[in-house]
């Protein structure tokens, strides 16, 4: 059974989410404000809540999700899953986002790529 992926695009204004089928069809999408002035923890909590909402509204579980692809507009350490710096979003300095998300949803792998590649990585 081929599983779906979640794509997350973290931008300066909004964080956009999508559930994507193995054939590239967007099954669900939504967004939430980034609110960078509130600090990265606020945005991370919004990301967690949005993932929970996405999974609930699409009846998704570990049985049909096998990865989350992230896109960030800044310097990323892909190997270690760390956001080194997002120049346009304050507070995102050396944030171990892959580790944070893996602890939140332990059954998926978290991938990090530039914004332009987030959906491609999500379909990997």
Residue positions per predicted region:
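Phosphate/pyrophosphate-binding loops at sites that engage ATP/ADP/AMP, CoA/4′-phosphopantetheine
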Residues: 47-67, 108-109
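Short glycine-aspartate micro-motif
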Residues: 5-9, 64-69
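Hydrophobic alpha-helical segments, especially N-terminal targeting/anchoring helices
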Residues: 20, 76-77
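Short glycine-rich anion-binding loops that position phosphate/pyrophosphate groups of nucleotides
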Residues: 13, 73-76
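Glycine-rich phosphate-binding loop and adjoining helix at the ATP-binding site
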Residues: 44-45, 77-124
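Generic short amphipathic/hydrophobic targeting helices enriched at N-termini
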Residues: 6, 22, 61, 111-117
């Amino acid at each position: 059974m081929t599983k779906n992926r979640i794509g997350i695009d973290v931008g300066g204004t909004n964080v956009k989410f999508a559930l994507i089928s193995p054939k590239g069809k967007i099954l669900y999408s939504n967004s939430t404000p980034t609110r960078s002035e509130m600090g990265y923890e606020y945005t991370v909590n919004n990301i967690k809540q949005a993932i929970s909402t996405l999974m609930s509204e699409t009846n998704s579980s570990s049985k049909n999700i096998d990865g989350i692809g992230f896109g960030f507009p800044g310097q990323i350490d892909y190997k270690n899953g760390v956001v080194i710096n997002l120049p346009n979003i304050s507070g995102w300095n050396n944030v171990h986002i892959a580790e944070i998300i893996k602890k939140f949803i332990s059954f998926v792998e978290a991938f990090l790529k530039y914004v332009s590649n987030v959906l491609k990585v999500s379909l990997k």
